[in-house]
């Protein structure tokens, strides 16, 4: 059933984090939320929901405290499979565009049920909206918006086939609050309305079952 989001990315980090990460103290948390450059090179913080690690002075959106883990150096953060922030460059090296786009798609795949905008994604994934839009299209061949739509329509197909949820409920489940817009988008991407897609899927299932 498509009710749960795949957390494989998070789990890939967790087995390494416990060995290398330090406890987050109030002092370090204050340094993070205040972007305190005085703590740069004293520690680095990683965000489990994005797979990115930063300097304390990074100007990106303040993460949820429960998603943060602390590393004394960049080597240990890298060893735990976190990748350096493209904005604050904690390793003083530029992250390859392909790796950055992988992080973005990974985040979308896990969080497509939420409200996603170019601005919010750029903030979460530590880049500028314009650069993110341009880089994503260069690597993937489609825009960020098109990719999000693709992921949502794919998830909607699963709901239509595997559940009896109402069309409006499915729209909400895949991150689209406006049911008429969802129906229009689904038809644009598949050539069928959601109701017609469900009907055809059931007919195909019945036909195959009677073979």
Curated annotation (Swiss-Prot):
It comes from the Bacteria. It catalyses: (2'-deoxyribonucleoside 5'-methylphosphotriester)-DNA + L-cysteinyl-[protein] = 2'-deoxyribonucleotide-DNA + S-methyl-L-cysteinyl-[protein] + H(+). Zn(2+) binds at residues 54, 58, 85, 88. The keyword Transcription applies. The keyword Cell membrane does not apply. Induction: Up-regulated by methylated AdaA itself in response to the exposure to alkylating agents such as MNNG. Gene3D superfamilies: DNA Methylphosphotriester Repair Domain, Homeodomain-like. Its EC number is 2.1.1.n11. Transmembrane segments: none annotated. Pfam families: Ada_Zn_binding (PF02805), HTH_18 (PF12833). Residues 102-200 form the HTH araC/xylS-type domain. Keywords: Activator, DNA damage, DNA repair, DNA-binding, Metal-binding, Methyltransferase, Transcription, Transcription regulation, Transferase, Zinc. The active site is at residue 54. It is an enzyme of class 2 (transferase). Binds 1 zinc ion per subunit. GO terms for molecular function: DNA-binding transcription factor activity; methyltransferase activity; sequence-specific DNA binding; zinc ion binding. Residues 119-140 bind DNA. Its cofactor is Zn(2+). GO terms for biological process: DNA repair; methylation. Is involved in the adaptive response to alkylation damage in DNA caused by alkylating agents. Repairs the methylphosphotriester lesions in DNA by a direct and irreversible transfer of the methyl group to one of its own cysteine residues. This is Bifunctional transcriptional activator/DNA repair enzyme AdaA. It comes from Bacillus subtilis (strain 168).
């Amino acid at each position: 059933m498509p009710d749960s989001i795949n957390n494989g990315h998070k789990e890939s980090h967790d087995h390494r984090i416990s060995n290398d990460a330090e406890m987050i103290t109030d002092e370090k948390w204050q340094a993070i939320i205040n972007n305190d450059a005085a703590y740069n090179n004293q520690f680095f913080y990683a965000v489990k929901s994005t797979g990115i690690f930063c300097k304390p002075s990074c100007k990106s959106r303040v993460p949820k405290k429960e998603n943060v883990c602390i590393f004394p150096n960049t080597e240990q953060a890298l060893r735990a499979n976190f990748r350096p922030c493209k904005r604050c460059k904690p390793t003083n090296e530029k992250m390859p565009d392909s790796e950055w786009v992988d992080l973005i798609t990974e985040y979308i795949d896990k969080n497509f049920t939420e409200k996603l905008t170019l601005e919010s994604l750029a903030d979460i994934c530590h880049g500028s909206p314009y650069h993110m839009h341009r880089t994503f299209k260069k690597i993937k061949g489609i825009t960020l918006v098109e990719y999000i739509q693709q992921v949502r329509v794919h998830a909607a197909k699963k709901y239509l086939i595997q559940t009896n949820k109402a069309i409006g409920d499915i729209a909400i489940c895949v991150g689209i609050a406006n049911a008429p817009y969802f129906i229009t988008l689904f038809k644009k991407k598949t050539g069928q309305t959601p109701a017609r897609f469900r009907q055809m899927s059931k007919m195909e299932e019945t036909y195959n079952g009677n073979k």
